[in-house]
């Protein structure tokens, strides 16, 4: 991550419409670069092409305000941090272009970068990351079952914590 980004400050909320939308709504003074917002549940999570992102309880719904030197590389940067984190846990993840992170052929999560410009100048960039952490197949809508997975389903670890997962992701993003 570029040295233009300070260490991250994580704020956790129980529920919100969308973590990306919230960071984009806030004045920059209230959400400077390095601000991170984690929701334990989202009511209007979005993915690529404005598709609805299932935000079932037990997922990590995280957005981070950044000041990147190259906003076009944010999706790859966010996915790479998640892949590195999975590797540190002994899990083999892959990137399904352009923004999905997969394990064993099933979608674990995704990244959604949003850049806002004022004229030709980058005003702000938000990186949204959604990861299925605690969900079982029964927690997902019937049409997604068999196509998605979660950390708890893919790991021999018996204990997972969404906030700790977000903190570890932010550390991976810093490196």
Spans of features found by a protein language model:
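Conserved active-site carboxylates
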Residues: 100
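Long, positively charged amphipathic alpha-helical accessory segments at protein N-termini or as interdomain linkers
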Residues: 2-6, 69-93, 103-175
């Amino acid at each position: 991550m570029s040295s233009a980004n300070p260490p991250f400050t994580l704020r956790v909320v129980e529920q919100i419409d969308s973590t990306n939308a919230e960071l984009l709504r806030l004045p920059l003074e209230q959400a400077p670069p390095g601000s991170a917002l984690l929701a334990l549940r989202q009511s209007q999570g979005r993915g690529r092409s404005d598709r609805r992102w299932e935000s079932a309880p037990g997922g990590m719904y995280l957005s981070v305000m950044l000041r990147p030197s190259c906003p076009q590389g944010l999706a790859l940067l966010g996915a790479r941090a998640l892949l590195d984190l999975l590797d540190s846990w002994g899990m083999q993840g892959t990137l399904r272009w352009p923004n999905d992170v997969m394990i064993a052929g099933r979608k674990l999560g995704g990244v959604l970068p949003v850049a806002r410009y004022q004229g030709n100048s980058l005003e702000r960039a938000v990186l949204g990351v959604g990861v299925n952490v605690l969900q079982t197949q029964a927690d997902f809508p019937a049409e997604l079952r068999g196509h998605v997975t979660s950390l708890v389903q893919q790991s021999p670890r018996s204990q997972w914590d969404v906030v700790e997962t977000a903190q570890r992701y932010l550390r991976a993003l810093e490196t």
